[in-house]
């Protein structure tokens, strides 16, 4: 059947004699177009080209194999139609030697053919990752040792500045990462020299004209535009309010100043304008003004003032000469870093030469060097009539340099296919700017032609509409690196037959939001695991729902619809580490067949942890943690009590020394210890002469551990994991490195550098299973049903906090370190690079989301865990819409995919529920996309999950045949199974609670099902040399105020000046930090002591402050719905009383609060803290035996006294 090509596809197939850039959107049939163009060229009736004179470069080996197969299929098909055509037969024969390959394979071929142009042994081999990493580590260790011996001044400066607290590990990691980065560049040494030259700051250098200033200024302008948008919203509100006319004119004037900042053309112009900005005092509002609106706009203005002040203080305090001096001061340490990189490159090169190996990066660099030879490059230019580059958006700078060298200029002969919106490999040094530069410079005419393929033949209209709706809102040239305009939008091109049995809205895109419990922190590993499991359960339930609903998918092979199968479903995750394992485990429990395609989690499996600990102990038994892991493992099965007894044998030494002493005991434990030590000695002796792989398998058999894990749940997979470790040991033995010590070091290095090996798989991905994979691995694939989960996970910005940042265009940005004063702060160069990397990282995240959403053919489901949905919805509702797009400022502020999606969707007509949460009524957008949102409560999911587990157990029990059992015995079994423990609630009651937790429980009138934390949070003092100018959080300000109120000498002068002097003394004595002292308002404290309550406190004979207490109260006083039987169940309560004083034999209690309090909310505050104050009063009477006659809260925010 003849393919019906679109006009744009046909143009891409037939255009000749030009450089052609095909911007091919997801699902647009780019591979089919590429294949057809190749067939068209080799069968051209006028100017045919043999297929072995074409260079076809693909991104992966799999893509190259697929391309070769598809070309072969087309040639065979044509040959069937024209069996007499000798040329077609010849092309089929030539296909075997056609250059259809990855860029690395092509470069390796160039190197093998022209090795004589390099100082390279012709018998060289490409080392695998294991061997080359070991060579790098060996070279680095030797280099560092040599430089220490020489007392190399530059190197020692580097060590002092960036060595870190754990030896040289941090500096070594920086070296490896930076070395890897610069080797992705065409001319790394030249790049390093240019970077170094920038830090020399020559006479003609102008920071204002530098690329660093340009980046910082652009980033600041985006932020100020966001502030201006906020001011605009406030101005609109003020226009509608009476009594705030003075506010309106002032806000308009200040908004004008912000606009002037944005319009600044240069750094110095911006500096002058921001220095000139001053915020006048707000005029008095009339009584008829709405208090809520007044407070809202006042707070917004305060935020603007604060941020403008921060920008000014951070970037525009220093004059040009001071900035130049700072950059120049960085030159010595940058020179030392550049020298270290070059020395390492030389040392590593020598190591490789000794072993006769080259590494992966060498392949491209050697090819580039060879192709710089005019004779060689002319050969390749002559050989290849046309160069095809697939996935062009993922090209690196060095790959672009290589392909540019062999391309022709007359006539141009490059055919490049890609989609910048799918460029997601920046971490592999892919540079989307290469594609984007051509995308903006190529046109429909001329020698450089651009062709757009935006008709999507993969997805249903519901998915196309949904993707367009989201990305037209959030993707822009600045964030995403392409403007999602009408030109970029996906156009529906698929031809799905109608399904007469389809239910209404069955294909609607679903958004499932799981509300996390309050006060949960997403960054804590245990709680992340909870979120992962809950999300996995929700996804599992939805998968089961698809089967229950009889969901059908279109099958091209049968030409109609069929019921959904597990293989039709794919769950996509941004990061599979931990997440994929949680999903796999949950699906197995739910009876859903699953294949998790992940390279992470291997080192976290119990069997691998145990075996690696054993290897570490055999290598060096003086390591307590691995040794304890081995002793507690099933191999030796020491109990906790036995380990305590062993430790008591030598409380101060290592565990190994304690074991040796315990071996002298004449009891059962002594015998057990002696058996362990004998085994250890035997294994140490064998490890000396046995190859690591053979020794490892010997351990598996000797310990019985391999058989043991096979009997555990998922035993087949666990044994497969042990075999993977054995295979890795075998590979290691094939390198030039030997011995257990080196192997253990190598594995440890893999773990610390996050280079996981991927757990073994016992289920194939082609079976009828749900696939769980990373979004990156899904690129180029398609699935009938796609579920994108983990969308609430925060973007990973960890790399931005590194001491040294680097960028191909902006160079290297170090932290400024004064190691003598133990002072460090980001240099202005680092700030510029940090801004740029953040922008590029967010752009990449946006493209990753685009790839995920465009994998779906028939059904798209999005899942996210969200903390406090109402608050998050309010945040989404505040995102400013400029035309059809959300402001770049709001897009930049977003911390997760769901923030982007939520901000885009909240104005959609289908998302009424979110608008109700946000308490907004915006003008609705009438878009053709269809959405459905469902809210899940995490607690309900956990309860449901436990019910499912219980039902599963009951079903298994019911399946047992009990008929043959003796009647009495059967009756006893049933009674035991049906027994309900009468004091079940006791098991859920905490042993201890803080007053804050009790206040929350009583205010909510809810019993937590899970144990509550018994520890109050404490803020630890930051070392002075690590303090940063970030400002204190409200909680930290409150702690600082309480600290001052506790430490003030009440007998001294308590005027404003006297209090300030005492605060200064507290800083000197290191009770307070400088930052805390600045945040404590002495005026507020002075005003307290002038109140009647404050005066009474000062007159009192006895005043006690910050008094901790522990009391015991009945559980029924806290959990009011408990039955009477719990009256004697007690809970320990702990807390700290701010202050009390004695007056006429009775006590007066005061609790200070630094909370922000809205006008008219005093009664709410009174109710909020009633439980807490009552408990403090009860505790005080118990511990003193005296009556508490009065209880007060003092609000520092508005100098208010609340009496109870």
Curated annotation (Swiss-Prot):
Keyword Hydrolase: yes
Pfam families to which the protein is assigned, alphabetical: PDDEXK_1 (PF12705), UvrD-helicase (PF00580), UvrD_C (PF13361)
Cofactor: Mg(2+)
Any one of the GO BP annotations: double-strand break repair via homologous recombination
Record domain UvrD-like helicase C-terminal: where: 492-780
Entry keyword Ribosomal protein: no
Catalytic reactions of this protein: Couples ATP hydrolysis with the unwinding of duplex DNA by translocating in the 3'-5' direction; ATP + H2O = ADP + phosphate + H(+)
UniProt domain UvrD-like helicase ATP-binding: residue ranges: 3-460
Enzyme Commission code(s) on record: 3.1.-.-, 5.6.2.4
Top-level division of the source organism's lineage: Bacteria
Entry keywords, A to Z: ATP-binding, DNA damage, DNA repair, DNA-binding, Exonuclease, Helicase, Hydrolase, Isomerase, Nuclease, Nucleotide-binding
CDD domains: DEXQc_UvrD (cd17932)
A cellular component annotation (GO) from this entry: DNA helicase complex
GO terms of molecular function: 3'-5' DNA helicase activity; 3'-5' exonuclease activity; ATP binding; ATP hydrolysis activity; double-stranded DNA binding
Binding residues for ATP: 24-31
Family to which the UniProt record says this protein belongs: Belongs to the helicase family. AddA subfamily.
Function text: The heterodimer acts as both an ATP-dependent DNA helicase and an ATP-dependent, dual-direction single-stranded exonuclease. Recognizes the chi site generating a DNA molecule suitable for the initiation of homologous recombination. The AddA nuclease domain is required for chi fragment generation; this subunit has the helicase and 3' -> 5' nuclease activities.
Quaternary structure, from the entry: Heterodimer of AddA and AddB/RexB.
Name used for this protein in its record: ATP-dependent helicase/nuclease subunit A
């Amino acid at each position: 059947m003849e393919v019906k090509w679109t006009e744009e596809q046909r143009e891409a197939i037939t255009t000749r004699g030009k450089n052609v850039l095909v911007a091919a959107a997801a699902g647009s049939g780019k591979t089919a177009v590429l294949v057809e163009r190749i067939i068209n060229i080799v069968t051209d009736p006028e100017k045919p080209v043999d297929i072995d004179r074409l260079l076809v470069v693909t991104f992966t080996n799999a893509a190259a194999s697929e391309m070769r197969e598809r070309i072969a299929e087309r040639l065979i098909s044509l040959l069937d139609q024209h069996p007499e055509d000798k040329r077609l037969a010849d092309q089929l024969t030539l296909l075997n030697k056609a250059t259809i390959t990855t860029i690395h394979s092509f470069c390796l071929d160039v190197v093998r053919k022209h090795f004589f142009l390099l100082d390279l042994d012709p018998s060289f081999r490409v080392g695998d990752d294991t061997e080359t990493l070991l060579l790098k580590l060996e070279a680095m260790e030797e280099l560092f040792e040599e430089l220490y011996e020489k007392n190399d001044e530059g190197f020692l400066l580097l060590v002092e500045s960036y060595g870190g607290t754990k030896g040289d590990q941090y500096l070594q990691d920086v070296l490896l990462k930076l070395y890897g980065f610069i080797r992705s560049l065409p001319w790394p040494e030249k790049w390093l020299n240019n970077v170094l030259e920038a830090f020399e700051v020559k006479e003609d250098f102008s920071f204002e004209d530098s690329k660093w200033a340009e980046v910082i200024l652009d980033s600041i302008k985006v932020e100020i535009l966001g502030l201006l948008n906020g001011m605009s919203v406030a101005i609109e509100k003020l226009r509608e309010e009476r009594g705030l006319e003075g506010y309106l004119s002032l806000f308009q004037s200040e908004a004008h100043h912000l606009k002037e900042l944005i319009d600044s053309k240069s750094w110095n112009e911006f500096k002058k304008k921001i220095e000139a900005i001053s915020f006048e005092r707000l005029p008095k509002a009339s009584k008829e003004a709405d208090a809520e609106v007044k407070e809202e706009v006042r707070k917004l203005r305060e935020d603007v003032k604060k941020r403008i002040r921060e920008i000014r203080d951070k970037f525009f305090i220093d004059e040009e000469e001071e900035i130049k001096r700072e950059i120049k001061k960085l030159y010595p340490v940058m020179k030392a870093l550049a020298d270290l990189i070059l020395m390492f490159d030389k040392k590593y090169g020598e190591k490789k030469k000794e072993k006769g190996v080259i590494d992966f990066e060498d392949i491209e660099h050697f090819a580039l060097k060879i192709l710089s030879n005019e004779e060689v490059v002319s050969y390749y230019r002559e050989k290849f009539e046309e160069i095809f580059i697939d996935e062009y958006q993922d090209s690196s700078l060095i790959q672009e340099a290589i392909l540019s060298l062999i391309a022709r200029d007359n006539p141009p002969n490059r055919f490049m296919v890609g989609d910048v919106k799918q460029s997601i490999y920046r971490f592999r040094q892919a540079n989307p700017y290469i594609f984007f530069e051509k995308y903006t410079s190529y046109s429909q005419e001329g020698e450089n032609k651009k062709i757009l393929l935006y008709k999507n033949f993969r997805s249903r209209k519901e998915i196309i509409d949904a993707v367009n709706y989201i990305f037209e809102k959030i993707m822009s040239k600045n964030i995403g690196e392409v403007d999602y305009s009408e030109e970029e939008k996906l156009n529906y091109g698929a031809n799905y037959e109608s399904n007469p049995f389809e239910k209404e809205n069955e294909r609607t895109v679903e958004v499932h939001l799981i509300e996390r419990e309050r006060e949960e922190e997403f960054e804590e590993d245990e709680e992340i695991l909870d979120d992962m499991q809950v999300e996995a359960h929700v996804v599992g339930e939805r998968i089961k729902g698809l089967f229950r609903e009889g969901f059908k998918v279109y099958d091209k092979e049968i030409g109609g619809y069929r019921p959904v199968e597990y293989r039709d479903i794919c769950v996509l995750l941004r990061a599979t580490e931990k997440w994929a394992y949680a999903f796999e485990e949950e699906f197995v429990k739910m009876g859903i067949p699953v294949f998790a395609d992940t390279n992470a989690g291997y080192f976290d499996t119990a069997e691998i942890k145990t075996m690696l600990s054993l290897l570490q102990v055999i290598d060096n038994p003086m390591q307590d943690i691995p040794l304890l892991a081995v002793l507690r493992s099933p191999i030796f099965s020491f109990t906790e009590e036995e380990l305590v007894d062993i430790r008591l044998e030598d409380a101060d030494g290592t565990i190994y020394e304690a074991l040796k002493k315990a071996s002298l005991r004449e009891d059962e434990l002594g015998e057990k210890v002696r058996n362990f030590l004998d085994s250890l000695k035997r294994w140490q002796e064998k490890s000396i002469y046995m190859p690591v792989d053979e020794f490892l398998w010997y351990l598996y058999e000797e310990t019985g551990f391999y058989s043991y894990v096979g009997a555990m749940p998922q035993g087949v997979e666990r044994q497969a994991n042990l075999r993977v470790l054995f295979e890795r040991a075998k590979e290691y033995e094939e390198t030039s490195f030997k011995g257990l010590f080196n192997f253990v070091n190598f594995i440890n290095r893999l773990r610390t550098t996050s280079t996981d090996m991927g757990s073994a798989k016992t289920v194939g991905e082609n079976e009828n299973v749900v696939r769980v994979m990373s979004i990156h691995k899904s690129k180029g694939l398609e699935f009938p049903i796609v579920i994108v989960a983990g969308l609430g996970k925060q973007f990973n910005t960890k790399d931005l906090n590194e001491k040294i940042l680097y960028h191909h265009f902006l160079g290297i940005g170090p932290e400024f370190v004064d190691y003598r004063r133990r002072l460090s702060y980001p240099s202005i160069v680092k700030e510029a690079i940090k801004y740029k990397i953040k922008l590029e990282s967010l752009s990449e995240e946006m493209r990753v989301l685009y790839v995920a959403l465009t994998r779906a053919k028939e059904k798209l489901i999005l899942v996210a865990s969200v903390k406090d949905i109402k608050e998050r919805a309010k945040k989404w509702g505040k995102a400013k819409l400029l035309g059809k797009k959300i402001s770049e400022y709001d897009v930049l502020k977003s911390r997760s995919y769901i923030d982007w999606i939520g901000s885009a969707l909240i104005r959609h007509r289908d998302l009424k529920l979110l608008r109700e949460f946000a308490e907004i009524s915006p003008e609705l957008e009438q878009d053709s996309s269809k959405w459905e949102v469902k809210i899940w409560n995490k607690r309900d999911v956990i309860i449901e999950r436990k019910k499912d587990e219980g039902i599963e157990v009951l079903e298994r029990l019911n399946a047992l045949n009990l008929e043959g059992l003796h009647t009495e015995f059967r009756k006893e079994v049933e009674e035991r199974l049906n027994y309900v423990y009468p004091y079940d609630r006791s098991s859920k009651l905490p042993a201890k609670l803080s007053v804050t937790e009790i206040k929350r429980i009583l205010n909510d009138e809810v019993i937590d099902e899970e144990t509550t934390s018994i520890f109050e949070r404490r803020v630890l003092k930051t070392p002075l040399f690590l303090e940063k100018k970030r400002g204190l959080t409200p909680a930290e300000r409150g702690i600082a105020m309480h600290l001052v109120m506790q430490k003030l000498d009440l007998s001294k002068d308590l005027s404003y000046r006297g209090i300030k002097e005492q605060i200064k003394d507290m800083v000197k004595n290191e009770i307070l930090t400088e930052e805390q002292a600045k945040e404590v308002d002495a005026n507020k404290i002075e005003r307290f002591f002038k109140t009647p309550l404050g005066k009474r406190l000062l007159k009192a004979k006895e005043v006690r402050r910050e008094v901790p207490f522990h009391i015991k109260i009945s559980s029924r006083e806290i959990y009011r719905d408990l039955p009477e039987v719990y009256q004697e169940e007690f809970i320990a309560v702990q807390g700290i009383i701010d202050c009390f004083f004695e007056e006429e034999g009775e006590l007066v209690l005061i609790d200070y609060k630094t909370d922000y309090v809205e006008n008219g909310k005093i009664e709410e505050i009174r109710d909020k803290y009633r439980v807490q104050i009552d408990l403090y009063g009860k505790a005080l009477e118990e511990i003193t035996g005296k009556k508490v006659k009065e209880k007060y809260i003092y609000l520092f925010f508005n100098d208010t006294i609340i009496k109870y």
